[in-house]
Amino acid sequence: MKLKTNIRHLHGSIRVPGDKSISHRSIIFGSLAEGETKVYDILRGEDVLSTMQVFRDLGVEIEDKDGVITIQGVGMAGLKAPQNALNMGNSGTSIRLISGVLAGADFEVEMFGDDSLSKRPMDRVTLPLKKMGVSISGQTERDLPPLRLKGTKNLRPIHYELPIASAQVKSALMFAALQAKGASVIIEKECTRNHTEDMLKQFGGHLSVDGKKIIVQGPQKLTGQKVVVPGDISSAAFWLVAGLIVPNSRLVLQNVGINETRTGIIDVIRAMGGKLEITEIDPVAKSATLIVESSDLKGTEICGALIPRLIDELPIIALLATQAQGVTVIKDAEELKVKETDRIQVVADALNSMGADITPTADGMIIKGKSALHGARVNTFGDHRIGMMTAIAALLVADGEVELDRAEAINTSYPSFFDDLESLIHG
């Protein structure tokens, strides 16, 4: 796919698609609750559609009509054995969280995904689930998909310290803990996104959170709810960066989720000197309107507890850093290596091929700015965030063309991305 290049300004206002993390969880909680759940503004990307289909395969009635998802919950013990293996597509969130959901189901399932998912380690989830009494295994010692799982009605509670900062592992264990008899204690390495905790309370569940320690008493019952999904800050991040680095630009992003566990990119933009305004804050929905303008940027250091708050935004932050004066250092981000691709290497290769100066490290990158970008051919390797990062980088290219291979990967999280880009170019 040939990308738009040499764009002189971006203007306009858009609503980004619904938050991917909240969309996944709304389907899961709605399915496990008793009674009806209605979900508004859900993301209809490929990953979320995979989760929706999996729960249909598990016997849950889910209707998508007039822009509203209606779920007839079956309760914590109401899932049915599927006729066939469960297809998770490209979605690491789906396979990990649903492994926890099925921990208390007394039937056997196989879960598989595409080529990319089949390279992602699941031992981070399988090891603690085995401690709870689940029979679960995959391929190689890292438990790569496909996974075979047989849950148990006699699920044991767990006391577990996460060796990595992972909201997916935490959430999988919370879903399992809801079905165990007794109190489970989950201790995070660093605080990660807390959508599962927030939504558990919304659906009538109970938990105790004390810093990095989460206690879930099981078993519990949940009750169907109305869920309004805010815009995804991970999708908004591409426009935040575009508005900062494309000259003569001003972008207004409406209804963006600003959950405090997800706003690391806002901290980074401010540390780099970017012009960013937050208005129309809704404290209940945890959403706001974000306004950015073209800015002169300076390098910064991104590390430690900040990393889990922006892990998915690091590819586009790397592009932002190529347009800042000085050096930006990203470290403590080894988790990037086991995303849809090895995002440390793939980001560095993609942007360096366009003229950036990025040195990959074991746990991050060293980025020297400011770089003039030129044309190149870039492969997403099936990673949606690499595709969108490259499309934003291409806007700065004055010399040559930018070809993007496997651009369809963007449909994973943002099917209307190129439509929104066109509207901002012509705004």
UniProtKB/Swiss-Prot annotation:
One of the GO biological process terms: aromatic amino acid family biosynthetic process
Q: Is Amino-acid biosynthesis a UniProt keyword of this protein?
A: yes
- Enzyme class, UniProt record, top EC level: transferase
- Which pathway does the UniProt entry assign to this protein? Metabolic intermediate biosynthesis; chorismate biosynthesis; chorismate from D-erythrose 4-phosphate and phosphoenolpyruvate: step 6/7
What keywords appear on the UniProt entry? Amino-acid biosynthesis, Aromatic amino acid biosynthesis, Cytoplasm, Transferase
Which GO CC terms are listed, alphabetically? Answer: cytoplasm
Record-listed phosphoenolpyruvate binding positions? K20, G92, R120, Q168, R343, R385
Q: Which PROSITE patterns match?
A: EPSP_SYNTHASE_1 (PS00104), EPSP_SYNTHASE_2 (PS00885)
- The residues responsible for catalysis, as annotated, are D312
Listed SUPFAM superfamilies: EPT/RTPC-like (SSF55205)
- Where in the cell? Cytoplasm
Reaction catalyzed: 3-phosphoshikimate + phosphoenolpyruvate = 5-O-(1-carboxyvinyl)-3-phosphoshikimate + phosphate
Q: What is its EC number?
A: 2.5.1.19
Q: Where does 3-phosphoshikimate bind?
A: K20, S21, R25, S166, Q168, D312, K339
**Molecular functions per Gene Ontology:** 3-phosphoshikimate 1-carboxyvinyltransferase activity
Its family? Answer: Belongs to the EPSP synthase family.
Q: How does it assemble?
A: Monomer.
Reported function: Catalyzes the transfer of the enolpyruvyl moiety of phosphoenolpyruvate (PEP) to the 5-hydroxyl of shikimate-3-phosphate (S3P) to produce enolpyruvyl shikimate-3-phosphate and inorganic phosphate.
Q: Per its record, how is this protein called by name?
A: 3-phosphoshikimate 1-carboxyvinyltransferase
The source organism is Streptococcus pneumoniae (strain Taiwan19F-14)
